[in-house]
Amino acid sequence: MERTPALYPKKRLPARLFWPAAALAALAGGGALAYYWRVFYSLDARGWPAPLLFGAAGALALLLVGGAWLIRRLRGLPARAAGCILLAGALFCFADPPMQAPDEYNHYLRSYSISQGRFDFDAQRTYPPDVCRLYRAFPGAWVSAHTSQGLAKDEGGNEIAYNSEGYALKQRGADGPVESVWDSFREYAAGGGAEAVGEPILFMVLPFLPQALGMLLARLLGFGALGCLYGGRLANLCLYAFLCYKALCNCQRGRGVLLAFTLLPLSLYMAASLSYDAHLLGCYYLCASFLGKEEFTRRDGAWFAGAFLLMNVAKPYINLLWLLLLFFLPGAPGRRVKRGGFGLLLGLGALAVTFFVSWYGVALRSNYGEIGRMLGEDVQQLPQLFFVLKNPLRYAAVFLGTLYENGFFLGQLGLFGALDLPVEVLNLASPLMLALAAALTCRKEKTLRRAPCAGALTFGLLYIAGAATAMYITYTPVGMVRIIGLQARYFLPAFLMLFWLLQKGLGRALRPAAGPERGEGLCLAFSGLFAAAGAVLLFQHYFVGPVYLIR
């Protein structure tokens, strides 16, 4: 096989020269970024000291190079990937303002209660003053909560309508102050009283134990409500990194695509939040990794069972679909037949766990009164399920139309916050990055293993249909012709399967120039850089710019 010079350079820069050169390049890049921010977003006029800005950019650049040097010294791709996840995930942890991940405000309150040793649910119980102050200063969906709309005048004096939707920063008048998330930090730091906050309508414990442990450690170290939030985020990130490490250790075929998904900005954004989606995504990637194994062993079955039961505690019913993979995992045909009994036991166990969690949430609940439906009586689950079964063609039209109008959600992988902060560059680049990972790590195979490929395709399509149907019967009034509430993160397991199949197809159609190890190394480097860039862009959109100008 011929080797292209681009992938196999004849001479490599010695390590004693490479890392100093990398540090200088990173400093130059950080300085260029700071200069761009300073000029394009008028940071001098907004009171940002130039020395502080350039100093922070340089320090961050050196920190990233130092982290890359440490990661390079780790042995094996899974360990290096876990290091990249921790490094880039930490950037997301601090780039994302408090309470901005989907439902993070409720997850924060429940996790804080658990960190105090409270495993029951009492609506009359309130939180400490600093927690209430943080909760009031940072409303969930901050961008939507601070969106302005109305009438203004253009340069010619004509009235025009304006809407600051999708902008985290806005400015009233060319010389007016810029309103941003910094105002919420100042409000929280100013102290003062805040209205009491009661426990949320959220009745689970197990999915919040990791972040509750992080909050407990932060509180023992003397941190307040804000420090507890970051402590919980970092604890979630560590668990996600461990699950991804285990998944990459399992996966021997198609590992490059799995690697790219673990480092996808949207994955890291959720992993570095207080949402239970952090370990939910880790469990998804762990279960999916068994498709890439040469042989599915009993120990693998134990890991699969643990991840499967945990994901069904957090999100029941839809995750029963993961049992389908048991019939397509590698192994002798006789073993696949035996897995039917194993799958039946897991399914019964998942249902038992679901009913126990539901009973626990009711039995230990007090002072909540009657809890109404989120969308009132317009949404009735069983009648809507029967409606879908009686009108399959109508639902198929609603399903396909919703996917089409949203670009099959592949163009929303850069949508952050509570679906209120789009980063268009990441919306465009994320699917391209996944396709690049598939191309870099494809390898020539004489024959495709039909069972894993059939399992990936079947699971991917059924998961998309199942996730959409679940949102239709639980959140969408039956008369609507569009399914509401769908998000790109719901489809990440299905996207993983489809890009894994793309990698297999490219391996059959192309002649890969790089060997498996070289391709995976390049994939790790590109995915890690893309993840770090995603965190920087998230910080920019929340704190620096673009700024919506209201004249």
Language model regions located:
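Transmembrane helical bundles and short interhelical boundary loops of multi-pass, membrane-embedded
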Residues: 29-56, 351-352, 360-371, 513-551
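Membrane-interface transmembrane helices that cradle and orient dolichyl/undecaprenyl
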Residues: 251, 287-303
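Membrane-interface alpha helices of multi-pass inner-membrane proteins
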Residues: 269, 300-316, 320-327, 350
